[in-house]
UniProtKB/Swiss-Prot annotation:
Plays an essential role in budded virus production and occlusion body formation. The keyword Oxidoreductase does not apply. It comes from Autographa californica nuclear polyhedrosis virus (AcMNPV). The chain crosses the membrane at residues 61-81. The lineage of its organism: Viruses, Viruses incertae sedis, Naldaviricetes, Lefavirales, Baculoviridae. InterPro entries: AcMNPV_AC78. The keyword Transcription does not apply. This is Protein AC78. One of its GO terms (cellular component) is membrane. Keywords: Host membrane, Membrane, Transmembrane, Transmembrane helix, Virion. It is a single-pass membrane protein. It is found in: Host membrane; Virion. Disulfide bonds: none annotated.
Length: 109
């Protein structure tokens, strides 16, 4: 069974009927009478007694801790790159030669 349809047969001659969104939705609530005069609570008032803000305090503390750790890690990474890459590539020249050092080659010749 072949379901391929050539593009010339998929023309746009079919008319699409639709309802404009402005007419489909009724946003005029001011003209309608209100059925509920009192506010509707989604959570009973008795259940809200045990609610406190500790979870947001803990999450704020975790965010601060993670940001401090990330800052320290970034600082250490930049210091390691500076120390092992940038400082090691610079050639260090000395104007004076230490002849008393035992590491000088051919000292005893």
């Amino acid at each position: 069974m072949n379901l391929d349809v050539p593009y010339y047969r998929l023309g746009n001659h079919e008319k699409v009927e639709y309802i404009p969104l402005k007419l489909a939705l009724n946003d005029d609530t001011a003209s309608e009478p209100q059925q509920f005069s009192e506010p509707v609570h989604k959570m009973p008032i008795n259940d809200m007694v045990g609610y406190d803000n500790t979870t947001s305090n803990v999450s704020a503390g975790i965010i601060i801790l993670i940001s401090v750790v990330a800052f320290i890690a970034l600082f250490l990474l930049l210091y390691v790159i500076y120390y092992f890459v940038i400082l090691r590539e610079q050639q260090q020249y000395s104007d004076s030669i230490d002849t008393d050092s035992p590491f000088v080659f051919n000292k005893f010749d």
